[in-house]
Amino acid sequence: MLERSLLLATLLSALCSANLFGNNSYVYYYQSAFRPSDGWHLHGGAYEVVNVSTESSNAGTTGCTAGAIYWSKNFSAASVAMTAPQNGMSWSTEQFCTAHCNFTDFVVFVTHCYKSGHGSCPLTGLIPQNHIRISAMKNSSLFYNLTVAVTKYPRFKSLQCVNNMTSVYLNGDLVFTSNETKDVSAAGVHFKAGGPITYKVMREVKALAYFVNGTAQDVILCDGSPTGLLACQYNTGNFSDGFYPFTNSSLVKEKFIVYRESSVNTTLELTNFTFSNVSNATPNTGGVQTIQLYQTITAQSGYYNLNFSFLSSFIYKASDYMYGSYHPSCKFRLETINNGLWFNSLSVSLGYGPIQGGCKQSVFANRATCCYAYSYNGPSLCKGVYRGELTKSFECGLLVFVTKTDGSRIQTRNEPFTLTQHNYNNITLDRCVEYNIYGRVGQGFITNVTNYAINYNYLADGGMAILDTSGAIDIFVVQGEYGLNYYKVNPCEDVNQQFVVSGGKLVGILTSRNETGSQPLENQFYIKIINGTRRSRRSITGNVTNCPYVTYGKFCIKPDGSISTIVPKELEHFVAPLLNVTENVLIPDSFNLTVTDEYIQTRMDKVQINCLQYVCGNSLECRKLFQQYGPVCDNILSVVNSVGQKEDMELLYFYSSTKPSGFNTPVLSNVSTGEFNISLLLTPPSSASGRSFIEDLLFTSVESVGLPTDDAYKKCTAGPLGFLKDLACAREYNGLLVLPPIITAEMQTLYTSSLVASMAFGGITSAGAIPFATQLQARINHLGITQSLLFKNQEKIAASFNKAIGHMQEGFRSTSLALQQIQDVVNKQSSILTETMASLNKNFGAISSVLQDIYQQLDSIQADAQVDRIITGRLSSLSVLASAKQAEYYRVSQQRELATQKINECVKSQSIRYSFCGNGRHVLTIPQNAPNGIVFIHFTYTPESFVNVTAIVGFCVNPANASQYAIVPANGRGIFIQVNGSYYITARDMYMPRDITAGDIVTLTSCQANYVSVNKTVITTFVDNDDFDFDDELSKWWNDTKHELPDFDEFNYTVPILDIGSEIDRIQGVIQGLNDSLIDLETLSILKTYIKWPWYVWLAIAFLTIIFILVLCWIFFMTGCCGCCCGCFGIIPLMSKCGKKSSYYTTFDNDVVYEQYRPKKSV
């Protein structure tokens, strides 16, 4: 059982109790009628304390008032517990009076009241002595009363209010409940002394309880702690050692939307109304009330366009006291009414009445807010509107009445209004959010992967998103200011998070996320858990040779959460097995060396299954539905975990049993590569050559291409006057005199002087030009030969390089074929995994394989029915995967056993088993690493020809003076053979006849074989020849049959054998081809000639040195701070001067320098 962070105590006898546990950190309630079966059950009923406060007294000095509610604290909580000190409080006005719980609609309280009289016991009335009252009140009326003797509750200890069924517990016993479930809105205890009262506010959490005979014996809170997450996700508190994937679904508080367009234009409806002139309109008969209205329009909310185009044939009459228009409340004309004016209400009508006073009087009579008058030179048939003019006739005109109020419900416009909505994609990164990406909704952890995806032109053809195998968005793209931005949608919680259980305890978490306090463990990160909380990072300590607990790769995770490295005990020594020779009359006498390649798989790829994530993905509805499936995921996971654990243990044992001591010790000396030339990979030995560093600094060097003879020339001209021997040191190359083409200044002066002197006296001194001409011809020869060799070498390099490239390409092809065969073996492991992932795209009879689409298209009940099919199908796929991995483990386990035998028998020694290490008699085996396995290269010798000899089982010896005895070959010595009438002994596997010696035989006491004598009744299946004719019976069955042995070369082995022999031969040919491509170039050399600087450069260096010394001396004299420099430079006369100058300052013990004041000398 898991060790939990909270102290889980056994709940006491009462099934209706509610006691605080875990250092008063939580409480567990359950009804008396709830008696589940034995085992773990996940349901509500647990409440965790989130806030604690205390109160000393609230009754004042006169005592508390019994039978009334005088004190209350406001809450909004699922449960509130009010507890007194351990000894409790007495039922008296000097200590405790009333405690209550307010569930908004009604109040439940417990009190006592033994007084009578006016104002006493206002809520309950007189209560009998030594009794308490438990009541419930609604709208000031008591609807529940329970009177209990104080013998049951001698003192007040606690009152707990719970929202579930509005339950109230007194001293841990259920005293009130109803069929309503409401949170606690207020509660309080009215008391004077005996406190303090502790208020504990709690929130409701699910709990996993372990019941025995209907009583909860153990409780694990589903509160987000590691223990709660693990137990409540797998519905059990008992876990064996292993790894358990989990998903921590946190509350998502943020949401964002990714829009297809950056902006959306919406054109709102524009209501058009066109006014027109009314023909045959009736004039008014007197007063404004008789003016008849036409074409009345009342605008609703929205946009309107009022067309008064017919007014172009009318003449507007401005306001002139009583005459014309009157619209002081309207600052617009009808011609401009569509210029974006806002109204809260608007009504427009046409009328025909007198221009004289018709508009003004209509506004005063509240028939309109504004009135516009227009003349069309009409007849004078309209009557007046004022009291003295009602019978008079005036000119009729068009009157436009506008009734309006200001506001923003109505707007007039000339054109339809276009509303532009700018969509800003504010994508929330690096935390769990709800998203709506191009219409697909879900939850995810969004990361920016633009830097990784920008170079691969993903979605470059206008695509918006890449979906994963389940149909959810995997990668989506958003057009940014500077180009496309790519984002990756990850699950909110790490899919690879796994709890680690070791020794029955939850000790850590394995995650693929590098969190604070984690430490690397293979390809994951490990977080240690102590007492239910995460602990800071600790390094891996100690080594162990074996691990009885849970292992991850080469690491052992112990029950205390610490990690140790598994270092298998190395094999100290090994010996070769003895020969086990069998008999054969055909003995081989000649052999061939054979190379056989064999691939054996020694490890399998482990898988980590997050069952809940695979089945439901990020769908919360699916996860709720999946809880009905019980421990099916636990069963699948247990199979996969056990396979992984066994795989790790056997793999460690495999390496520990085959790795000899000193295996990792490098050999760095006496390395022989045989005929393989790897000198290009080695650093050539350094040797001192060339001039010194000073010479390289003081001289200018010139390098040129030279011939092999240039080294001898350089040695010949070495020395201060070497340039004088230039022509004497000339060398011959292929019969031609050659000199390096570089001429120094000394040589140039020498040859020029010789040439000029030879021309001074004509033919007499002409012989002086011979040295000049000779050295010139030699240098031209050098240039010509060098250019010719360079051209030839270029042709050789090109031809050889082309040949080498061809061989390298062929080598790469051969290597790829060999690797392809290994890959075919390895890829068999992933076929079932590929099929499992492909199942995510199958709908298994549902309308879609995408869970989000199903819940969006159907209601809850229909969607659950469809998703139930997908859950069943995906669970079946996971079961197939688990079974396949289990079968693969058994096969790989057998392969490892075979590989262990191969290493011990073939690699570490010579096998005596024929054709076990390759084909034939074993000589040598070289192992090589391969993906998920080992390739063995077996060198064996196989028989080419045989000698047919007569084999003798043994000899029976009959001595003259003793009883007879028999001799047979000793085990492993061979067999007796007869050759030309003589007897020899020879090995069974190689024909080497030799004389028989005493060490080759074993003496038997008798020449006869021992048999057991029995009668006929013992062996009932034996028949005589008279009763049964074998020849006749066998002829019935064996006629027309062929007696041929099967062709074992075509036998279908279950062990995958990798044959790369032909590829190895091809690679060997390529190596030979590369060796043939070595280039034998004509040897050239680099000639380096040093040119001395001119005399004026040396003169400038000398002047600069002198100036530097003078400036340095001047600084010493002027500053008086020459110090030790005088002595260092050996300037003895200056030392006294420096001493006198520096003595002007005196340094005291406090390291403060003062200037000494010397007395002035009189002149």
From Swiss-Prot:
InterPro entries: CoV_S1_C, S2_sf_CoV, Spike_S2_CoV, Spike_S2_CoV_C, Spike_S2_CoV_HR1, Spike_S2_CoV_HR2. Specific enzymatic cleavages in vivo yield mature proteins. The precursor is processed into S1 and S2 by host cell furin or furin-like protease to yield the mature S1 and S2 proteins. The cleavage site between S1 and S2 requires the optimal sequence [KR]-X-[KR]-R. Additionally, a second cleavage leads to the release of a fusion peptide after viral attachment to host cell receptor. One of its GO terms (cellular component) is membrane. Residues 823-867, 1056-1084 form a coiled coil. It comes from the Viruses. The chain crosses the membrane at residues 1097-1117. It holds the Pfam family CoV_S1_C. Keywords: Cleavage on pair of basic residues, Coiled coil, Fusion of virus membrane with host endosomal membrane, Fusion of virus membrane with host membrane, Glycoprotein, Host membrane, Host-virus interaction, Membrane, Signal, Transmembrane, Transmembrane helix, Viral attachment to host cell, Viral envelope protein, Viral penetration into host cytoplasm, Virion, Virulence, Virus endocytosis by host, Virus entry into host cell. Glycans are attached at residues 23, 51, 74, 102, 139, 145, 164, 179, 213, 238, 248, 265, 272, 277, 307, 426, 448, 514, 531, 543, 580, 592, 670, 677, 948, 961, 980, 1015, 1039, 1052, 1075. PROSITE patterns: COV_S2_HR1, COV_S2_HR2. Residues 1025-1106 are annotated as: Heptad repeat 2 (HR2). GO terms for biological process: endocytosis involved in viral entry into host cell; fusion of virus membrane with host endosome membrane; fusion of virus membrane with host plasma membrane; receptor-mediated virion attachment to host cell. The keyword Glycoprotein applies. The record marks R538, S539, R691, S692 as: Cleavage. Residues 1-18 form the signal peptide. Residues 19-1096 are extracellular. A motif (Di-lysine motif) lies at residues 1160-1163. Residues 1118-1163 are cytoplasmic. Residues 770-875 are annotated as: Heptad repeat 1 (HR1). Belongs to the gammacoronaviruses spike protein family. The di-lysine motif confers endoplasmic reticulum localization for type I membrane proteins. Homotrimer; each monomer consists of a S1 and a S2 subunit. The resulting peplomers protrude from the virus surface as spikes. This is Spike glycoprotein. It comes from Avian infectious bronchitis virus (strain 6/82). The lineage of its organism: Viruses, Riboviria, Orthornavirae, Pisuviricota, Pisoniviricetes.
